[in-house]
Amino acid sequence: MIIVLSPAKSLDYETPAHVQSYTQPAFVDDASELIAGLRKLSPQDIATLMDISDPLARLNYQRYADWSPIFTPANSKQAVLAFNGDVYEGFDAKSLSAADLDYAQQHVRVLSGLYGLLRPLDLLQPYRLEMGTRFANTRGKDLYAFWGDRITRALNEQLETRRGASRVLINCASTEYFKSVKPKLLAAPVITPVFEDWKGGRYKIISFHAKRARGLMARYVVENRIAEPKALQAFAMEGYAFDAAASNDSTYVYRRRVGE
């Protein structure tokens, strides 16, 4: 089983990492190619392209200038400890043991506009480049064209080492990021967990809660050493419960009703 997550725009390079082990990202050459293109942009170009404020554009202009193809603990941090958004608050990697992170290294992957596909302990230099950004590059009009089937092929290499029911991809990424994966070319079925909260008289996906729940699901997989998808149906963190009637073989629906 492999579970894929989206990255986070918010990053934490202030908190010291609680583990020393790290690995190198697989797609450094590809990232270098993107950085070369990004370095041609002015801060104003970046602000327009990414629809961000001028201060944030200047910050990322400097990040691209500082970026190095050599990753060390001095200029980088393990990806799952550097990302700091809603998903990663749910995953809470800083409270996982070294053994937990070792299991995560085998079973969790993060999709990235700049880095393609990351393992939890892959070193990460700070950046901003969302997968949906229409950044024209040497391979096409956007990042989906740039990555093509590279991410899918990398996932297949890892999925093909799994056997039986454990050869499955659990999609806990956003639609924007999962578009970088080509399910028809995957060597495994895809199961997408969906998290719904009761609001306004019906169950609906509430973005903030759903993002956090995806991180909680990844943590559940890691802490419980889950290898087969049926075991995911027992997930019940923070009030969510599996709804068999609303689910099917490719979509697992979890619902939560807190008050009225």
Swiss-Prot record:
| GO cellular component terms given for this protein | cytosol
- Pfam family, any one: H2O2_YaaD
Signal peptide segment: none
InterPro entries the UniProt entry points to: YaaA (IPR005583)
What GO terms describe the biological role, i.e. biological process, of this protein? response to hydroperoxide
Q: Which HAMAP family match?
A: UPF0246
Family classification: Belongs to the UPF0246 family.
What is the protein's name according to its record?
Answer: UPF0246 protein Bmul_1054/BMULJ_02209
